Structure formats: C-alpha cells, structure tokens
Amino acid sequence: MSYTRLLARAVIGGLFIGHGTQKLFGWFGGPGPQGTEQMMQKLEMEPRRHQALTAGMTETAGGGLLALGLATPAAAAGLTGVMLTAIRKVHLRNGPWNTNGGYEYPLVLIAALLTLADSGPGELSLDR
C-alpha cells in the first residue's frame, strides 16, 4: 500500500484549506472577507463579494474534499480553476519565478492537482 497520494492530498488539501479560511474568516493572518473583497476590487474582479466568497469557499471545500479523497477529480478541477485565475490575474505579469511573485508555485499546485485527478486519490481515501 502506498501512502504517497495520501500525503500529497493531505498537504495540498491542507494548504488550500488554510488559504480559503484566510479569505473567509481571517484565520492564519489572512485578510478575512473584507480584505479579500478589497483584493478582488483591486484585481477588477466584480462582483467582488461574490468573487471573494467563491474563491474562499472553493479553496476551503475543495481542499477538504481533496484531503479526504472524496470527489477528488471534482475537487481538483475547482482548485485548478482558482489557481488558473490567480495566475492570470496576479502572477503572470511577474514572470515565472516565485521570488518575483511569479506563477511558479500556482503552476506546481496545478500539476499536482491534475496528477491526483488523473491517478486517483489512492487506496486510503473516501472515494475508494
């Protein structure tokens, strides 16, 4: 039995849960709903409240589903959409490297999400 997909799901899902709860509740030093709405306004993503809630809920719920190995392809698809939006609206103009705020990190997350969606969640999952 391989534990690598469980580890990948737990780490990636946990990171997304953390980022989502930063947006929704201000946990872990995050901006909370008002700060996230302001960020969406600066990015010209309207309606900003809807965009902020959608991003936070997708990251939180998608991260939870991914960590549990439940509806893994759907969770990975939703989270990939969030990362593609982050690349397009925030990171692309900064080039590839993370040191300049580039798209390196979200791109790695997308690759990991697509790998999990394709290979499945593994034996230790609720999908099995």
Question: Which positions does each model-derived feature cover?
Answer:
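Extended, low-polarity transmembrane helix blocks
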Residues: 1-27, 41, 49-57, 68-128
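Conformational-control "hinges and anchors"
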Residues: 63
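Membrane-interface interhelical connector segments
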Residues: 26-44
